Amino acid sequence: MKYVYPAMFYKEEDGRYSVLFPDFDVATCGNDLNDAMNMAVECLALQLVGLKRDGDPFPVSSPVDTVDPVAYAEELGAGKPSDYFVNLISVDADEYAKLHFNKSVRKNLTIPVWLNEKALAQGINFSQVLQEALMERLQA
């Protein structure tokens, strides 16, 4: 499922961009606008995946017209920004997690010869059985 939240982009004096998400009180940055956009997607995805993992609710997305980058910057003590904008960032947190967090790792295991032979004879996928057993054990 896609989620959409507003992000405030501030251009820094050195040309880099700071990005703040008012609904989460998290921030990221990028070397240029393209990098900042990519980092904003990653930041939002990480935040949503973390909330979901912890069983915490997602905050309600603020309407774009209620987000005030000037007031937010002044509240942080940064003064009035000269170059800024608000943009909506959209991310499918589940899909992002699958692509970036659910990578497989190779594990070696030791089992008795007789068990190995029986499993091979039945065409059992060792990786799948191990994953299923671990998932079941971790949910218990």
Regions found by a protein language model. Give the residues of each.
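Amphipathic alpha-helical recognition patches that constitute DNA-binding helices
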Residues: D35, R106, N125, V129
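A short, charged, amphipathic alpha-helix used as a generic interaction element across diverse proteins
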Residues: D35-L46
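Short, charged, surface-exposed hinge/linker loops at domain edges
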Residues: K2-V4, A45-N108, W114-Q122, A140
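Hydrophobic pocket/interface hotspot
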Residues: V19, A36, G55
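Short, basic amphipathic alpha-helical segments that act as recognition/interaction helices
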Residues: F126-A140
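Short aromatic-glycine-(Arg/Gly/Cys) micro-motifs in beta-strand/loop hairpins
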Residues: F9-D23
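A short, exposed loop/beta-hairpin motif centered on an aromatic-Gly-Thr core
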Residues: F24-D35, N108
